[in-house]
Amino acid sequence: MASIHKDISIDAPADAVWDAIADFGALHTRLAPGFVTDTQLDGDARIVTFANGAVAREILVDCDAARMRLAYAIVSERLSQHSASVQVLADGAERSRVIWTVDVLPHEIAPYMDAQMELGARAMQTRFHRHRP
């Protein structure tokens, strides 16, 4: 199984970043606009449309406000395994770090997933840099 890790520095307080991450249906407006173009809630899942045209059904596994950690999974024909977590850590009063981890199979999809996560990380940084909470 391939594990992909991103440690993302964000120019915003941890509470503000967590609030955007925990808003499960607003990925396209509050966390990663431009990278994600639409998010539709469907029960405990969200249907995410990415800027490149890809669509994924992400199932909410856990949303732990005390730990500022959200876990989700993708079930699809292309993936035999996908589990992910996003956790926010304070880095002083005005900055935070987002730890985004994805475990995925098959291994062959890992380079694509890594590149997409890098675009997502940049979108998060841009969103908070331009729109201070």
Feature map (PLM): residue ranges:
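Glycine-centered tight beta-turn/hairpin loop motif at sheet-sheet or coil-to-beta transitions
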Residues: 1, 51-53, 79
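Hydrophobic ligand-binding cavity/cleft-lining segments
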Residues: 1-38
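Hydrophobic pocket/interface hotspot
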Residues: 17-21, 27-28, 46, 60, ...
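Short, conserved beta-turn/loop elements at beta-strand boundaries and strand-helix junctions
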Residues: 64-68, 93
